[in-house]
């Protein structure tokens, strides 16, 4: 698992960037975007960072299915068949006096998270907590500034103990580790992080990958992290392996189980890689699922 994480952080993130550059720009949404909404009495904001555009070459999606099978899924959904677009976003939770950020995007070299945060009326020094779903570069890259200093200097940075150990031992995030170590607090899967937020273990993607369930009264939202990546492919064919997953069979089983639960419950979710702002529900369709967005960009 730790080996998979090391490979994932370096080569997978590099493939993201290379593929995105190869496909130039997609003008779907502004570079800087902040979409506010509520869960019960809580104020939340979906923050845009960047997006990746990957070729449909079966090197990331459909590893065990092939290009033609992926093409069919994309065509059936009315999407372009030569490329797969993934958003990269973060979630801000305003919980009383606490400003809690879930994940941090790719960082200053390619992301606009800080600009989107400021557009929402919040400066980095106001963030009190940063919750990390897992240690891939498009989720922890924004923990440091271009000069290597902590981006959220007044925040506690929280993640599972297993994920922190994997990041430290991986060798691909040494600058981040050096900068944030004094800020890091770890927890066990399933821990209550704040009165409104609980971690939810979703195994397979990385050693300590976690989702976060946000609750206010009778309303809930699950920030799913990288439990699913494509709003089309990961839902239509959740059994297909994805290159990003460290333990692919376990990640597949976790994905199928989670999507089934979400379709039955109708629970609202935030997915950082689904089309921005990534807020919606999962519905059953045939042998798979479909994405039902609840908010427009």
Which role fits each region the language model picked out?
Residues 102-104, 128-138, 158-160, 202-204, ...:
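Active-site neighborhood of phospho(di)ester-bond hydrolases with catalytic His/Asp-centered motifs
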Residues 32, 55, 109, 135-142, ...:
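Active-site environment of divalent metal-dependent phosphoester hydrolases
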Residues 55, 99, 105-182:
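Active-site HxH/HxHxD metal-binding segment of metal-dependent hydrolases
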Residues 26, 217-297:
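Cap/insert and terminal regions of metallo-dependent hydrolase folds
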Residues 8-19:
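Bacterial N-terminal signal peptides
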Residues 25-26, 38, 122, 126, ...:
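Metallo-beta-lactamase
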Residues 30-119, 211-228:
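Conserved beta-strand hairpin/beta-sheet module of binuclear metal-dependent hydrolase folds
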Residues 20-24:
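Sec/Tat signal peptide C-region and signal peptidase I cleavage site
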